[in-house]
């Protein structure tokens, strides 16, 4: 009978540590200024890549998508309020969502950032279906700012703490515990 290999936890890599550090810094800053850190932390996690190029790509996807979805959501919600001042016909949001997704995809293609469609669609759906009428503009603007803060934190951390600068520390940790890795994790 063949013996199954033992399960072994993967090591903790630089990207893992820098992502955790970035999200924690965002949360600490937001707690200090009395704001909810959720979307800044999400931006920080999305914005961390294995290097600056990857951070730009990952963070750009999130930020560009959030900005497109945020402005589009504000415009469509404004149109919804013009067409339906009483707010009783929620079903009107369905064709507005369909229109919004089409426009979002076209805009993402125009900006040559097609991977911004998914995060942009999330923001669009939240604004249309889950944001109170009286706060949809402030919600969308806050979401864009918070996402930008998180992405910028991760890009700064990746810029200030590149792999080349951290490798000597990583070697020391690897020698003492054997668990920290320099891989993509």
Regions found by a protein language model. Give the residues of each.
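Alpha-helical transmembrane segments and their membrane-interface boundaries
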Residues: 1-185
